[in-house]
């Protein structure tokens, strides 16, 4: 009988996957080292805390890291970031690893799961990246979040119309939101415009597939009946 492959064997880094990701989204050697340390930690924690889908472990770099790094090309001057629902750290920890090279760079990671929040704090410590982890629910604690943000991000957290509602009170002149979305992005945009006046830009993901990035720099509320307004929260 063939032996079963161990979890450790499955989660070993794939150097071809790493090279492919760094060709798509090049970073400095220092940032590469921080990302390597982060992914090593993620593989260790994955055995006890489900941080990413197990099927994506062999493609951590292309499926998750490059997907996160591409946001930097859309906000090259952003230094103060906030990531809703950071989970296993994509894109929040990846962005923090990159911000370590910039004066004033900082990422606030918002996560409601205590175990995942503990992982995020350890990832910041191990990589020496500038960031703060807030154990919070993104829908109930907006007043606690930092002000003066340059960019707000989210990936696989909530429907677009809800994310826009969470981001709106945190956005100021010159700030933007970058939301990573999948193949249903057009339907989500249609739903979002029922509640919000936005002028979104859509960017196809550099990692291919059906991924999209929704870029928003202006949000106004649509004139809606009270019941519809409550649904947008």
From Swiss-Prot:
Localization terms from the record: Cytoplasm
Keywords from the UniProt entry: Cytoplasm, Methyltransferase, rRNA processing, S-adenosyl-L-methionine, Transferase
Any single GO CC term annotated in Swiss-Prot or TrEMBL for this entry: cytosol
Major localisation: cytoplasm
Gene3D superfamilies on file: Vaccinia Virus protein VP39
Name of one Pfam family that matches: GidB
Catalytic activity from the UniProt record: guanosine(527) in 16S rRNA + S-adenosyl-L-methionine = N(7)-methylguanosine(527) in 16S rRNA + S-adenosyl-L-homocysteine
Molecular function (Gene Ontology), one example: rRNA (guanine-N7-)-methyltransferase activity
Binding site for S-adenosyl-L-methionine: 85, 90, 155
Region spans: Disordered: 1-25
EC number per UniProt: 2.1.1.170
Role: Specifically methylates the N7 position of guanine in position 527 of 16S rRNA.
Record-linked NCBIfam families: rsmG_gidB
Family recorded in the similarity comment: Belongs to the methyltransferase superfamily. RNA methyltransferase RsmG family.
Protein name: Ribosomal RNA small subunit methyltransferase G
Source species: Rhodopseudomonas palustris (strain BisB5)
Higher taxonomy: Bacteria, Pseudomonadati, Pseudomonadota, Alphaproteobacteria, Hyphomicrobiales
